């Protein structure tokens, strides 16, 4: 059993809920699975939570880091508590500086997260490398809070854009910072259905690479979405290389009339086909073959 699971089991031994770390076979592959059984019915995803306040640097601040491939995590909340202050008075009194503080870092290929919460402010989810499937997850933050070079689908996830008590220190934020580096790089973030809401005005994304790729499909976008939608950041001049698109989205934030002029206007039918779960990340049916229990 990987040491990661042993460590988490010890960490959560006094929490509400029960952590199970399982090794299950799927064909000739071992699927490492973390399952949290909730105590009682109707208590939701936040019954069992891992917390940490790391913030020294992005690559060492993560509350939960997953390196191996074939990981499945269910029913777990992961929070980086740095930046999550209880009052602005406290923040002002401490001359508080918002810093990158990662809740989860994912390096392994073929990793899946179901019914999980990820809470932070800046750099909440480091979707680093590999193919990943997030389903029915809650993701909270304000600045680049889903970032990296992963090849991932976020299915039916709720994105909450908020800086909490530090709201006055964040004029506007960014949901994604995707780092696709070349035209042949398969990475990208696809948001399938789900919703975006909150209290902090946010861009849907800013470029973390010259071929950055983020697509929202049939997502409910609230008025917190900045009218321009997208930002080139350090990659001005590469706008025609980005793939930023919104397909059949709805809600007050889906108004395209003031979007940046270089946003992609992709054909709905072909976009939904190209960036479907089966075509984008599950060509070999690793998701379809994840053990259900």
UniProtKB/Swiss-Prot annotation:
Name the Gene Ontology molecular function terms of this record.
pectinesterase activity
Query: Gene3D superfamilies, from UniProt?
Result: Single-stranded right-handed beta-helix, Pectin lyase-like (2.160.20.10)
**A GO cellular component entry from the record:** extracellular region
Q: Which UniProt keywords apply?
A: Aspartyl esterase, Cell wall, Cell wall biogenesis/degradation, Glycoprotein, Hydrolase, Secreted, Signal
Signal peptide range in chain numbering? 1-21
Residues bearing attached sugar chains per UniProt: 75, 160
Q: Which GO terms describe its biological process?
A: cell wall modification; pectin catabolic process
List the Pfam families: Pectinesterase
| Keyword Glycoprotein carried by entry | yes
For this protein, the Enzyme Commission number is 3.1.1.11
- Does Signal show up as a keyword for this record? yes
Catalyses which reaction(s):
[(1->4)-alpha-D-galacturonosyl methyl ester](n) + n H2O = [(1->4)-alpha-D-galacturonosyl](n) + n methanol + n H(+)
Q: In what pathway does it function?
A: Glycan metabolism; pectin degradation; 2-dehydro-3-deoxy-D-gluconate from pectin: step 1/5
Give binding positions for substrate. 81, 206
Q: In which tissues is it expressed?
A: Expressed in siliques.
The role this protein plays is: Acts in the modification of cell walls via demethylesterification of cell wall pectin.
Q: What is the official name of this protein in its record?
A: Putative pectinesterase 52
Q: Which organism is it from?
A: Arabidopsis thaliana (Mouse-ear cress)
The encoding gene:
PME52
């Amino acid at each position: 059993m990987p040491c990661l699971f042993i460590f988490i089991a010890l960490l959560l031994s006094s929490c509400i809920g029960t952590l199970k770390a399982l090794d299950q076979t799927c064909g000739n592959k071992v699927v490492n699975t973390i399952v949290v059984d909730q105590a009682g019915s109707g208590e939701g995803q936040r019954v069992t939570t891992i917390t940490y306040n790391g913030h020294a640097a992005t690559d060492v601040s993560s509350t939960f880091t997953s390196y191996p491939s074939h990981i499945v995590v269910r029913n777990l909340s992961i929070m980086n508590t740095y930046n999550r202050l209880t009052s602005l008075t406290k923040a002002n009194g401490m001359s508080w500086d918002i810093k990158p503080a990662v809740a989860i870092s994912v390096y392994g290929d073929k990793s899946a997260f179901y019914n999980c919460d990820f809470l932070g402010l800046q750099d909440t989810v480091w979707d680093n490398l590999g193919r990943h499937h997030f389903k029915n997850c809650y993701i909270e933050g304000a600045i680049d809070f889903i970032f990296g070079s992963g090849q991932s689908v976020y299915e039916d996830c709720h994105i909450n854009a908020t800086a909490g008590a530090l709201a006055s220190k964040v004029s506007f934020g960014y949901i994604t910072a995707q780092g696709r580096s070349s035209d042949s790089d398969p990475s990208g973030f696809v948001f399938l259905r789900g919703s975006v809401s909150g209290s902090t005005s946010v861009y849907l994304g800013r470029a973390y690479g010259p071929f950055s790729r983020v697509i929202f499909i049939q997502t409910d976008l609230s008025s917190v979405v900045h009218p321009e939608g997208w930002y080139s950041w350090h990659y001005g001049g590469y706008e025609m290389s980005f793939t930023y698109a919104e397909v059949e989205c709805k809600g007050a934030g889906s108004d395209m009339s003031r979007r940046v002029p270089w946003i992609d206007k992709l054909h709905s039918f072909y976009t939904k086909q190209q960036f479907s779960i089966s075509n984008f990340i599950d060509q070999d049916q690793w998701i379809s073959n994840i053990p259900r229990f």
